[in-house]
Amino acid sequence: MESTSGERSENIHEDQGIPKVILPADFNKCSRTDLVVLISRMLVSLIAINENSATKKSDDQITLTRYHSKIPPNISIFNYFIRLTKFSSLEHCVLMTSLYYIDLLQTVYPDFTLNSLTAHRFLLTATTVATKGLCDSFSTNAHYAKVGGVRCHELNILENDFLKRVNYRIIPRDHNITLCSIEQKQKKFVIDKNALGSLDLDSYSYVNRPKSGYNVLDKYYRRIVQLVGSFNASPDKSRKVDYVLPPNIDIVSESGSQTTQLKGSSSPNSHSSQKRYSEAKDAHIYNKRSKPD
């Protein structure tokens, strides 16, 4: 995959011989290969943590989901992600959104856990949904299924299951995860504003924050560089390289966000009477743009 960054610089650690790459501040200017490396490191780290925790549970405490494989696929997370990115031409925003979707899905579907049995199907589903929701052009599910190594019918089921669980809130926005959690508890697609308490969603509307989606992904980008930018920070050793951001770039601001789950979210648009929530439009756009196989 090509590098899209003119800002990427590299030097060698004299003590360990590990290349040090200074990434661009903007994830859209980062090499897609570097993004895949970072996200793969994050995923492998999460898998290691979750599977270590799962060993303490009995079999009857583990719930199988549609994302489970019978056995772990014989392709690494990194190589699988590279395959999806290369043959489906995944864009930067799609790569980052696949990571964001982990927090989103786990919020409304506690039975889902990212592990060696679920990671591959989740990645395939996440990148398929994100591509359709965020990109102007995309392929059919038949293509994505072939690249991902599953049957098209299975991918259709996974995609539909994901969309229903997150109420079609597939665009990363401030307070999106919070709203999904409230909706899941209330069993409603549109939340009564009185149930939101002190959460002021008007200030988070698309009109007031047109770059909300970018800002959420930017937080995830900076956070994963902080957490797994170092080669020694993750069990994934696919690429021997250390990643850092430019020295004048802040990592993740702790105000208004959380470090483990950057609970961004979405908001109602009080300036438009026909759109109570911008996510209702997201669902309409997704259905309109999705093509049958």
UniProtKB/Swiss-Prot annotation:
What are this entry's molecular-function GO terms? cyclin-dependent protein serine/threonine kinase regulator activity; protein kinase binding
Coarse class of the protein's main subcellular location: cytoplasm
Activity regulation note: Inhibited by the CDK inhibitor (CKI) PHO81 in response to phosphate starvation.
Annotated effect of mutating residue 163 to S = Temperature-sensitive allele
Per UniProt, which keywords does this protein have?
A: Cyclin, Cytoplasm, Nucleus, Phosphoprotein
Gene Ontology CC terms: cyclin-dependent protein kinase holoenzyme complex; cytoplasm; nucleus; Pho85-Pho80 CDK-cyclin complex
| Biological-process GO terms, alphabetical | intracellular monoatomic cation homeostasis; negative regulation of calcium-mediated signaling; negative regulation of macroautophagy; negative regulation of phosphate metabolic process; negative regulation of transcription by RNA polymerase II; regulation of protein localization; vacuole fusion, non-autophagic
Q: Where is the composition biased (Basic and acidic residues)?
A: 276-293
Q: Which residues carry this modification: Phosphoserine?
A: 234, 267
The compartments listed are:
Cytoplasm; Nucleus
Task: Note down the stretches annotated as region Disordered.
Answer: 254-293
| Compositionally biased intervals (Polar residues) | 254-272
- Sorted alphabetically, which Pfam families does this protein's record hold? Cyclin (PF08613)
Q: How is it modified after translation?
A: Phosphorylation of Ser-267 by PHO85 is required to form an active cyclin-kinase complex and for function.
Q: Which family does the similarity line name?
A: Belongs to the cyclin family. PHO80 subfamily.
Summary of the function given for this chain in its UniProt record: Cyclin partner of the cyclin-dependent kinase (CDK) PHO85. Negatively regulates the expression of phosphate-starvation-responsive genes under phosphate-rich conditions. The PHO80-PHO85 cyclin-CDK holoenzyme phosphorylates and inactivates the transcription factor PHO4, by preventing its association with the transcription factor PHO2 and the nuclear import receptor PSE1, and by promoting association with the nuclear export receptor MSN5, excluding PHO4 from the nucleus.
Quote the subunit structure annotation. Answer: Forms a cyclin-CDK complex with PHO85. PHO80-PHO85 forms a stable complex with its inhibitor PHO81 under both high- and low-phosphate conditions, but PHO81 only inhibits the kinase upon phosphate starvation. Interacts with transcription factor PHO4.
Give the protein's recorded name: PHO85 cyclin PHO80
Please name the source species: Saccharomyces cerevisiae (strain ATCC 204508 / S288c) (Baker's yeast)
